[in-house]
Amino acid sequence: MMFRSKKVAGIALAVASVTALAACSSSGSGSGGGNNNNGGSSSVVKVPGGIGSIPMAAAGAKKKAGTITWAMAPGATPNWILPVIPSANNSVYNAFNFIDQSWRPLYWTVNGVVPEVVNNMSLAAQPVYSDGNKTLTIKMNSSYKWSNGKPLTANDLLFTIDFIKAAIKASPANWAGYTPKHFPDNLVSATAPDASTLVLKLNGAVNPTWFTEDILSSVNPMPSADWAKSSASGSVLPAAQWTPANMAGVFKYLTAQAKSVSTYTTNPLWQIVDGPYKLSQYNTTTGAFTMVPNTTYGGPHVTPMSNFQAVAFTSDAAEFNAVKSKSIDVGFIPSANIPQLPQVLRLGYNYFGEPDFGMNFLNYNFKDTTNHFNSIINQTYFRQAMAHVEDQQGWISAFMHGAGAPAYGPIPAYPKSPFLPSNAATNPYPFSVSSAVSLLKAHGWTVNAGGTDVCQSAGSGASQCGAGIPAGTQLKFNLIYNSGSQLITSEMTDLVSKAKQAGINITLQSSNFNYMISNYLDPYAPANENKWAMQDFGGETNSTYPTTFSLFNTGGSNQIGDYSDPKADQLINASITSSDPAAVRSEAQYLTASQPSMFEPNNDYTWAWKTSIGSTMPEAWENLTQYYTTPEYWYLNG
């Protein structure tokens, strides 16, 4: 699970424009990512629910290498290089757009707009589970090796697991994928009987889909034959010496190197990769970077490969100016510029947009004691009242220009999911200020529309404000938002206005994405837990199995506001230990009713690329809508 800004996810197409531009494409279907389908009967790929189209590569098309430029999201530039990512750096921008280019995850889990494991982009065959799903055997993919010629082995995976253990021992915040009592705490043993095989024995049964696609996909093997040392001049430790004490030294050394951003391009550690690219340039001020092909890359890719240059921008407007001036090869289309999509086409770009698999949300802080907010937000009726003042359809129409889909719980209504619960198919708390007012009045609040509501009837009775809320408490608190996103800014401004009509007095405070995920995400930022009541930095990207494990379970590694509910914990635990597909649906149904966050509509994430840029498979463009960047498939037309 990775956090993301919604800054460029606020990309939409006016309904009128959909009709006008539909003539530019013909219908078809995706070929299924990793399959390297280079042609078909249709000249374009048209994905249901998406906007725009993706031209298919012409048979026999000439391909040449050069440098292809790609636009980064303003304010969300990469700032971490080590494949084991701390919570403070846990974003799709560090993981999918930067680190994964050089160090591939064990399992690649996005196939264009289809959430599934892509076998030939994964470093191992899918695990074989046995012993009641308590043992799994992993066979490494022999196609992959390190850029210095050394083989990629099971020992590299074992080394990475031992490194993660050392990181967690120093601080649970050192690995964003960690939740106490779960991986790697639940490992009874990890052994490598031969160079290509790793056997993991767990202390309890797991859901195989979840463990493969949520947990193991978060593990990027690291080169043990070169990185298993505690200093630049130190000897590389053999596997027999990967003791906790020795691994503590390795962790300290590699982490110190990762913090030295000024040496990213000169440190020889970062040149040993198994992914398609090596870092060649990195701007410590802007985060812009350039990567060159790893000529020994064993995964699927175009031949020849081009350099990949990530360009930094200070604002959406600056980025779109680059599109208009044709100075960027692959760029996003900000929501404010959607009416100009016909112009973008005339400039010589293709475009495609689709919602991603994750969720957009406004987070509540269940630990903020300021003005008794922790007690207020702990009341389910109040969270439901907040849902009633969220105008999802209005946001889709006004801010997404019609190209968005509502989401009423952790599993959005679109893209379609077989796990969608019945209570999330339609809005259980439709926009209605009067409904919010009725809920507040029914629970002991004196409503002052346009002003600030006051708790009149203190207590924990059915018609009272709730436990821990004294009489005279005002409904008054702050909301910190990612002001780099015009979409978030518009949504939060509208939310504050609608809430005010119900006497809920919210003060907006602006911030930026990187600062927010580093300073306001509990449980690893406790010093700031009384500095925010609500926050909206964007959202998160789900795996193919949409459990909210680590996000909404008590003590979860990606907990943002410390929501804790024994019933939710029970259902989430069932989702990750049972093979019953109904388990995760039951989890989502409960959370849709409980509203641990304010769930927001999903909007299309739209990208444009020059017609002079091709791809050997359409999924490489679809991947962008899911925050994954796969430039190893892109090429310059010859």
Regions found by a protein language model. Give the residues of each.
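Long beta-strand-rich cores associated with HINT superfamily self-processing modules
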Residues: 609-638
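Aromatic- and charge-enriched surface segment that lines or borders ligand/interaction sites
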Residues: 125-172, 193, 199-201, 319-322, ...
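Gly/Pro-rich hinge or "lid" segments in bacterial periplasmic/extracellular proteins
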Residues: 111, 219-300, 438
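N-terminal lobe/hinge region of extracytoplasmic solute-binding protein
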Residues: 68-131, 272
